[in-house]
């Protein structure tokens, strides 16, 4: 696994689309993460964005949803020769699903130093005991992906401060 794999114009195009999908998550109050699954002919076969809050489902991460959609579209849970683009480094749960789906390649934008399973926090695919290997390319549009998340969490913190101040002012009356 080499994080410095060559990034193509197509990789950037798909990551920009994943960022658009992340906007859908944000519009729903979800953490803005988007994912796009592409087959070897460069056709989009699955897409997803975070829906854990909306669906009350801790597994409804963008990656999982994109993999599920892709599997349904090709009617096979093995997503051989496909590439998954995701705006944030996958967590361990998503890394497990990625492994089982047998995708050929993973491309992600921002690193996740809290829960990232592809090198930032954990090294899920580096274990020699894994029964599948895949190519990983990291850092595609990393700045844009990271900024989207930073802006979201900054806004969320500001909203919490306002809410807390409002509750305090109401309790003081």
UniProtKB/Swiss-Prot annotation:
Catalyzes what? Answer: adenosine(34) in tRNA + H2O + H(+) = inosine(34) in tRNA + NH4(+)
Residues that bind Zn(2+): 61, 91, 94
SUPFAM superfamilies linked? Cytidine deaminase-like
Give the EC number(s) listed in the UniProt record. Answer: 3.5.4.33
The molecular function terms of the Gene Ontology recorded here are: tRNA-specific adenosine-34 deaminase activity; zinc ion binding
Which top class of enzyme applies to this chain?
hydrolase
> Does the entry feature the keyword Hydrolase, yes or no?
yes
Hydrolase in keyword set: yes
Fetch the InterPro entries from UniProt.
APOBEC/CMP_deaminase_Zn-bd, CMP_dCMP_dom, Cytidine_deaminase-like, tRNA_aden_deaminase
Q: Which family does it belong to?
A: Belongs to the cytidine and deoxycytidylate deaminase family.
Could you give the subunit structure recorded for this chain?
A: Homodimer.
Q: What is this protein called?
A: tRNA-specific adenosine deaminase
Species the sequence originates in: Haemophilus influenzae (strain ATCC 51907 / DSM 11121 / KW20 / Rd)
The primary gene name is: tadA
